[in-house]
């Protein structure tokens, strides 16, 4: 059965355990856990997310699957909403709540962190794919409010590079803005709702593009590949 509840944002279909059957990774937003449905080959699937990886993203957005190191195993990229610089992180994201984190884990959900994940496929154990999250080591853990990753060989060197689409029209999570709004009474907020929405800050953010360095790390290539504002 794959009829599980989740705030699903995307799904990637690939043969993660190299058994000839397509599996399904479902990326879920907020505390609802991701699912990794392994194809049993008989029309049924089994969720193996906890057996396959130690951690996932929290605000899970888009995903893409590809072999990033040409070892014949399919890896997975999942984007979240962590800004690359400290100023934007503090302005737009609350700190992780340890009490909420552990209550979620103790309720049977997975370990989820507010950063991108790059799940490097290490092979299989009894038909279950085993992943290591190398997003920080690879240099792709924080790419702002990201929507979807795309792997492709953009420079034609035989390795999968990474494009990430980003951005929102307004800074809808800007904490300084909401601190100012909170100073206005509830009725006045209703009366001035349109004016207040127009005052919401905005900050253009580049889409990100990363060159695959061939050693499971990536380098941001926006300037070199003319993909900056």
Annotated model-derived regions:
Residues 1-229:
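Acidic, glycine/proline-rich Ca2+-coordinating loop motifs
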């Amino acid at each position: 059965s794959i009829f599980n509840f989740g705030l699903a944002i995307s799904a990637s279909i690939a043969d993660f355990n190299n058994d000839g059957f397509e599996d399904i990774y479902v990326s879920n937003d907020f505390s609802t856990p991701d699912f990794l449905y392994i194809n049993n080959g008989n029309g049924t699937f089994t969720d193996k997310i906890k057996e396959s990886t130690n951690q996932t993203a929290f605000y899970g957005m888009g995903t893409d699957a590809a072999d990033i190191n040409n070892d014949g195993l399919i890896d997975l990229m999942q984007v979240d909403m962590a800004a690359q610089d400290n100023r934007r992180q503090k302005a737009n994201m609350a700190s992780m709540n340890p009490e909420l984190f552990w209550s979620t884990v103790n309720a049977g959900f997975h370990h989820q962190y507010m950063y991108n994940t790059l799940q490097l496929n290490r092979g299989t154990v009894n038909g279950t794919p085993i992943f290591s999250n190398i997003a920080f080591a690879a240099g792709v853990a924080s790419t702002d409010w990201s929507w979807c990753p795309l792997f492709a060989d953009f420079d034609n060197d035989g390795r999968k590079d990474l494009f990430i689409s980003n951005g929102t029209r307004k800074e809808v999570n800007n904490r300084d803005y909401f601190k100012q709004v909170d100073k206005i009474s509830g009725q006045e907020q209703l009366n001035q709702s349109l004016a207040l929405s127009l005052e919401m800050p905005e900050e253009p953010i580049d889409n990100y593009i990363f060159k695959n360095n061939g050693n499971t790390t990536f380098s941001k290539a926006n300037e070199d590949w003319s993909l900056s504002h």
